[in-house]
Swiss-Prot record:
Note on cofactor: Binds 1 zinc ion per subunit.
tRNA processing among keywords: yes
EC number(s) recorded for this UniProt protein: 2.4.2.29
Region (RNA binding) residue spans: 247-253, 271-275
UniProt family annotation: Belongs to the queuine tRNA-ribosyltransferase family.
Catalytic residues in the record: 92 (proton acceptor), 266 (nucleophile)
Originating species: Rickettsia canadensis (strain McKiel)
Binding of Zn(2+), residues: 304, 306, 309, 335
GO cellular component terms, semicolon-separated: cytoplasm
The reaction(s) this protein catalyses: 7-aminomethyl-7-carbaguanine + guanosine(34) in tRNA = 7-aminomethyl-7-carbaguanosine(34) in tRNA + guanine
The name this protein goes by in its record: Queuine tRNA-ribosyltransferase
List of residues binding substrate: 92-96, 146, 189, 216
Gene3D superfamilies membership: Queuine tRNA-ribosyltransferase-like (3.20.20.105)
Length: 361
């Protein structure tokens, strides 16, 4: 079994191209992770997701603990076997979903108590329980339990949140079962305040996580403020460890973040947009529901090798989406995931060549 490691092969200014080695294989960076919230990438087979070029996907602790339960998945051989995905899996800690989906959640020093959005059952999620659930799932990369600071937040509110996240990170780290090829990432918080981002980073670096994530962005602050935070936050982190920007997935945001030193991304944008009839292309987004595509016999993109582009016209995709046919969601999702993996591949190529890539879309 391979040890967990991160090797930077090439840098261009702050942008890095490299490889993360894990127990479940290698991850080429910069990397985009499709989101498999409930143990599936919606409208896709796991092997089809692999064919798009994805090296890693994301699963969600909150949803999987509720259904079918982490204990059941463990009895069935772990999440990799359960969903027939044999590459790395990163699971989030569940905290963000608890705080955003549960109408009645209470945050204390111990953790977060909440009611299931499914049936109202009461649960308590603590740093220890979150870490245990991710262990039972067999996650390649486990995320420390954190409080995602709401936006906007005052300096004092953000400071209190950072301090709680640091204490929870310490408990998460102590609960983490170290195994060769597996990792745990700490999550930097601090809202839009440089002083707090720096303090959060310093506190978590002391805990010696295998990697670090930047949380609390893409929550309403806008691209300008997000990039401002990214201009300085990666500088506070070890350069020899992966840096993951959570929940960010617009192509322009990815490009701007990579140029500021980010290595990993996740977002529901390609899958959700695909199911809603929106395709990403090198020439801009295409709303396939638009009536102008009803007689368009051309593919979404001529040089895209996904099944939607190789085998079907925009007119056919328009028809499928308009009538609500499941195949339409599948083909549009397949195309979008392929687009995002091609985007990451192109970015890696430009970094290796020592060239700017801010014009890529």
């Amino acid at each position: 079994m391979s040890k967990f490691s991160f090797n930077i092969h090439q840098m261009h200014k702050k942008a890095r191209s490299g490889v993360i080695t894990t127990a479940h294989g290698e991850i080429r960076t910069p990397a985009f992770m499709p989101v498999g919230t409930r143990g599936t990438i919606k409208a896709m087979l796991s092997e089809s997701v692999a064919e798009t070029g994805a090296d890693i996907l994301l699963g969600n602790t909150y949803h999987l603990m509720l259904q079918p339960s982490s204990e059941r998945i463990a009895r069935l051989g772990g999440l990799h076997k359960f969903m027939n995905w044999h590459k790395p899996i990163l699971t989030d800690s569940g905290g963000f979903q608890v705080m955003s989906l549960s109408k009645l959640c209470k945050i204390t020093e111990e953790g977060v108590s909440f009611s299931s959005h499914i049936n109202g059952d009461k649960y308590m999620l603590t740093p220890e329980r979150s870490t245990e659930i991710q262990y039972l799932l067999g996650s390649t990369i486990t995320m420390a339990f954190d409080e995602c600071t709401a936006y906007p937040a005052t300096f004092e509110e953000a400071k209190t949140s950072v301090q709680l996240t640091t204490r929870w990170a310490d408990r998460s780290r102590k609960a983490f079962v170290k195994r060769e090829g597996y990792a745990q990432f700490g999550i930097i918080q601090g809202s839009v305040y440089q002083e707090l981002r720096e303090q959060s980073a310093k506190d978590l670096v002391k805990l010696d996580f295998e990697g670090y994530a930047i949380g609390g962005l893409a929550v309403g602050e806008g691209q300008e403020l997000m990039f401002k935070v990214l201009d300085y936050t990666p500088n506070f982190l070890p350069q020899n460890k992966p840096c993951y920007l959570m929940g960010v997935g617009k192509p322009a945001d990815i490009i701007g973040a990579v140029s500021r030193g980010i290595d990993m991304f996740d977002c529901v944008i390609p899958t959700r947009s695909g199911r809603n009839g929106q395709a990403f292309t090198k020439y801009g987004t295409v709303n396939i529901r638009n009536s102008k595509y009803a007689d368009d016999d051309e593919p979404l993109e001529y040089d895209c090798l996904c099944p939607a582009c190789k085998n079907y016209s925009k007119a056919y995709l328009h028809y499928l989406v308009k009538i609500g046919e499941i195949l339409g969601s599948m083909l549009m999702t397949w195309h979008n995931l392929t687009y995002f993996q091609n985007l990451m591949s192109r970015i890696r190529t430009y970094i290796k060549a020592g060239q700017d890539f801010d014009f890529i879309t």
